[in-house]
Amino acid sequence: MSELDPNRVVLSPAQKARRINQNPDLYGTFAEIGAGQETVRHFFRAGGASQTIAKAMSAYDKDFSNAIYGPEPGNRFVCESRLKNMLRHEFGLMLERLSRKDHPTKKFFTFANTIASSTYERPHSGHGWIGVRFQTAPDRPTSDVIIHVRLHDPDISLQQESVGIMGVNLIHACFFHHKDPQEIMTALYDNVSRHVVEIDMIQMNGPDFSQVDNRLLSLQLVKRGYTDAVIFGPDGQNLQASEALYKKNILAIRGSFRPVTKVNIDMIMNGYNTVSYTHLDVYKRQGASCPLE
């Protein structure tokens, strides 16, 4: 049963993995780096994984990871760009190495995650990116679902277990609920508590989600209590706040902005000028150049 809908039947991770393994047309690769090497284990333990899993790998060493997927700006590893590069690289290898003549009915997929668990020095720092690139028909272009999670369980092993279950939920939802984005969001928390895993960003792209407004998905995250705040860009694409604001100077103005008025513009410009002058004065006293100049 679901905590949101008592009448909704919730499958266990083993049941979901087994359902995928028993489908002869689903075939894919798993790439899990960092602390998130738990998802594929559910598929191996469910039985029948040989007809589902083309490859399972973990480029755990940072140098090896960079050699495979390329370095990221700032030499980061747990970031959205790394996840997207993993999905692109691994799915590309499937198309390159598997002949469509030999697999005419297969619907390919790639699951990837890059996770940093909490440490004793930073007990609430666990977070990561999880994503699936998949086909809903053999000749259909791929669609992507990407989420960012924050891990709040104090036990590192339980953080990893939660990530593994959520990965199974995501793969299962992409294949069996791709026509209902709301159900995908609901299914992500099957057998996972919202108190231990927080989803603060979700993005659905591709032909199977051509009618999806990702901004509304962001608002759903807040409405459902999955997270406290969300951010999206002017292009309508959802952003993960710490990723989008990484090493940025931030000026925030409260308001509805419907429409944007001259008063709103004046507030922004006066606020910016105030912050700029304050920072400029501080940097000059320190004998350094101000990044806001």
Residue ranges with predicted function:
Residues 95-192:
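N-terminal accessory interaction module
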Residues 286-292:
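N-terminal low-complexity segments that are often proline-rich with Ser/Thr-Pro
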Residues 2-139:
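Short alpha-helical segments enriched in small residues
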Residues 23-25, 243-251:
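A short, charged/proline- and glycine-enriched loop
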Residues 263-277:
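Histidine-anchored nucleotide/phosphate-binding helix
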Residues 278-286:
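Conserved small/polar residues in nucleotide/adenosyl-binding loops
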Residues 179-240, 245-246:
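Non-catalytic propeptide/linker segments at domain boundaries
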Residues 32-33, 253-267:
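Short, glycine-rich nucleotide/cofactor-binding loops
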